[in-house]
Amino acid sequence: MAGRPARMHEMEVLAPRRDIEPDLRLTLLSGFELSFRSRQVPLAPSGQRLIAYLALQDRWVPRSLCAGTLWPDSPEAHAAANLRSVLWRLNVSQQPLVETSRSDLRLASTVHVDVHEMTRRAEHLLRPGGPHATAVREGV
């Protein structure tokens, strides 16, 4: 369709520069905290659950799976309505937290997640031939 804006998952997303502090930061390891430019962003518990779930998935997730996971005891239509409501409430912030397509969701690529950083560091340390890989594997 001509003139249609490209969706985020249809474009190549560049990794954030490491020398610049990210505007949006999500901390999960020591409890849920979302901050924008070092100021805490309050979210309702349902918004926190969605953001944490998407952060841990670290990929595009079908809307139906999100709804079913976050509201497992609700009928499918009610769970889908709950998800739409949470997305609408999250959408009122100036910084987009969730990227959406017609059928899928993911955490916005602009959100720095502590779990992702920890995973990258662990993978770096355990990389075959890396300086710490042998010591870590041998328990030294």
Regions found by a protein language model. Give the residues of each.
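Short boundary/linker motifs that mark transitions into or out of structured domains
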Residues: 1-46, 96-106, 111
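Short amphipathic alpha-helical recognition elements used for nucleic-acid or partner binding
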Residues: 39-70, 90
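C-terminal flanking helix
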Residues: 84-87, 91-95
